[in-house]
Each structure stands twice: as structure tokens, then as C-alpha cells.
A protein has these predicted regions:
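Active-site-proximal, structured, solvent-exposed surfaces of multi-pass membrane proteins
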Residues: 1-264
Length: 264
């Protein structure tokens, strides 16, 4: 598992990343930090898998049905990605398909929060007996553009050893700790980027950036550092000043009224 905060010098270009299709984005993102200016030449390790399936299937049933499919080859120590499009022929009825415990759902079109989820994706690991257990909801719908990919799970397991993790400490800040950076690169967090965050390295404010397409990060140099991350919502300072001024006006008014009464 990748740490909550870590440093890495494996930097992948944001521009290049945007050219990748799913699922090739998955391991590329996991094994690199995606930043504005990156030079990593990483190539996705996902491989197309032939499941021996037709390109499309029509499901027409009056009740929920469970089916088991035996895979043509062993997927031991592999991660399986499945994806396909769903065409709901009865849009006033929801469609859900669960594969090995992972559920995707297309809500009915009359739902107050219609999700428009017509593309189902599944990321499946630890497949037992090389079987896929599939649960189809009742309804009339078509599955098309079925695609499958595999990835050796070692590519995921080894990543944790390749990054420098932050040793977290307790403190008043949102995140506080020390880190020993092997090579200059980027500090990466799992915090969604927001202008209210302030990162300090060795008690000095640094410029934060959007990394990994949507998260908070910043540049960091090689060596041992102390890291602290604080969060102050936008407008916090001006709001604090206005509140303080408002309080002072109330206090001064109170003092003035008391003085006026004493003089009377």
C-alpha cells in the first residue's frame, strides 16, 4: 500500500498521461507521480486478455440470476480488469451486474439522481479457482465492447519499496512528520488539491502544486526534511480579521455606553 505522504523521483508528464486510455492509466499512475514536467518513460504493464467471449451479449430475464464462468487460463498472482458498455432496453428499470463481489449499477432513468453509468469497469484480484461469479439483475439489456486485461500483482506490491514514506508524528498540524528523500523529486499526498493547504518543508512555506491529476504535492530536494501541512480555508485570514474587528467594535460600543451612563 502506498503511504499517505511520500516522495518519489519517478515523474510522469501530465501531457503524456492524458494520452493514455484506461486501464493503462492505472499502473502508470501507481508507479509514477504525474506532474506538469515529468520525464519518466514508464510503459504500462497491462496485457490484453482473450476470454473467449463474444463481443456482445443480450440479457433478458425476469429475475436476478447468478452464473459461474471458468477462465481459460490461470490468473494466479494477477489482477484482472474487465470493462464493457451497457445498453438498457428498459431504461425505467435499473441494471446491476456484480462480478466476484464488485458491483456496478446503472440507475433507472426516472431516478432523481440518474447516474448515467453506461460503462461498467471491474478491478478484480485474488480470483479463486480461476472462476468469475457473475450476478445479473433482472431486466432487458445488452452488454457490448467487452474487454479484459491482466497485470502481474508484483508490479503493485513492489511499489511501496520504491518510494520514501513520511514518518508521521502527532502535532497540531493536519500532517506532521519527517522524511528522508533518496533523490530530488516531488512530495506526494493523498489530499485533494485545495488552495487552502499550506505545505512547509523545514519550517519554510513552499509552493504547492496539483499532482496525480487532482492531489496536493510539491517539489522536494534530496535529504532529510521536516514536513508539516496545514489547512486554512480560502478567506480564513480576512474572515478572522473581520471577526476580530467586529468584536472590537462591540467592545468599544459597550465601553462607550458605560462611560456615557456614568457621565449622566
Amino acid at each position: 500500500v502506498i503511504p499517505v505522504v511520500y516522495a518519489t523521483s519517478q515523474l510522469y508528464s501530465q501531457k503524456q498521461f492524458q494520452k493514455l486510455n484506461y486501464p493503462y492509466t492505472l499502473d502508470t499512475l501507481y508507479n509514477n507521480a504525474v506532474v506538469e514536467k515529468g520525464s519518466s518513460t514508464y510503459q504500462s504493464q497491462f496485457k490484453v486478455l482473450n476470454l473467449g467471449l463474444d463481443d456482445s451479449y443480450t440479457i433478458h430475464q425476469k429475475k436476478k440470476t447468478n452464473k459461474t464462468y471458468k477462465l481459460l487460463q490461470s490468473l494466479k498472482n494477477k489482477i484482472l480488469v474487465l470493462e464493457f458498455d451497457v445498453q438498457n432496453k428498459k431504461p425505467k428499470q435499473a441494471v446491476s451486474i456484480t462480478i466476484n463481489g464488485i458491483k456496478n449499477k446503472l440507475s433507472k432513468i426516472t431516478s432523481p439522481y440518474y447516474n448515467q453509468n453506461t460503462h461498467f469497469t471491474y478491478l478484480i484480484s485474488n480470483i479463486k479457482n480461476d472462476e468469475l461469479i457473475v450476478s445479473f439483475s433482472k431486466g432487458n439489456y445488452k452488454l457490448k465492447n467487452l474487454k479484459a486485461y491482466t497485470l502481474d500483482d508484483s508490479i503493485i506490491k513492489d511499489r511501496e519499496k520504491e518510494v520514501d514514506s513520511l514518518s508521521l508524528e502527532t502535532g497540531k498540524d493536519l500532517i506532521n512528520g519527517t522524511i528522508d528523500v533518496s533523490n530530488s523529486g516531488y512530495l506526494i499526498t493523498h489530499l485533494p488539491y485545495d488552495q487552502g493547504y499550506q505545505i512547509q518543508i523545514d519550517e519554510k512555506n513552499v509552493k504547492s502544486e496539483i499532482v496525480n491529476t487532482a492531489f496536493l504535492g510539491c517539489k522536494i530536494s534530496k535529504g532529510k526534511h521536516r514536513i508539516s501541512i496545514q489547512f486554512k480555508p480560502k478567506g480564513y485570514h480576512s474572515g478572522f480579521v473581520l471577526s476580530y474587528l467586529g468584536m472590537m467594535i462591540v467592545v468599544f460600543n459597550y465601553i462607550y455606553e458605560r462611560k456615557k451612563k456614568n457621565e449622566e
